[in-house]
Amino acid sequence: YIGWISNKQYELINEKQLKLLEKNPQVYSYDLVEFIENDKHELIAIPLGSNLNALNILKHKYDGNKISGVQDKSKIVSTALRFLNSPYSWGGRTPFGIDCSGFTQMVYKLNGYKLERDSHLQAKQGSPLSFIEESEPGDLAFFDNDEGKIIHVGIIMDNNHIIHASGKVRIDRIDQTGVYNSETKSHTY
């Protein structure tokens, strides 16, 4: 995905600093929104999942919650719930706008797992299951269109529920037919 940032939103680092960043384990913000304070004492808002590795190099301060390393699979659903009701925005990856594969990618990233960006690529990772009854909370569920192309992904929860980004990050029922939206009273995927 091609995007843009304001030239006020980045700082150049040298080769030595880059090597240090690449060597250190990844650390991410774990609050919905928190602030970092730069060396000019300006507050900068950062969303859930922001990479905090450069804080020391840039002499920024951060007092919020952090997460790093590979977490137990049981933590995936609780991480997903942090995004609940975030609005849908194609290409988005923050609580201020997120799409289905950006949602699963960010939830897994916060738990120490790397997923591809698009749902059809994520579907190629891991091991496929034959039946929904074989799934566990934290597993990914993929949905295809009439042509067989993967177009949607969500995270399996307990009791035949799924959390996914469709209009917003929401919880719906899931069965062998697909995702049942209680608002529209129909299967949407």
Q: In which residue ranges do the predicted regions lie?
A:
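Catalytic nucleophile-His microenvironment captured as a short glycine-rich beta-strand/loop
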Residues: 140, 150-161
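A flexible loop/linker signature enriched in serine peptidases of the S9 family
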Residues: 146-147
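Structural motif
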Residues: 50, 138-139
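Short, basic/aromatic beta-hairpin or loop at an interaction surface
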Residues: 18-34, 106-122, 157
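Boundary regions of SH3-family modules and the immediately adjacent low-complexity/disordered segments
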Residues: 1-86
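Aromatic- and glycine-rich peptidoglycan recognition patches
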Residues: 12, 18, 129, 157-189
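Catalytic cysteine-centered active-site loop
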Residues: 88-136
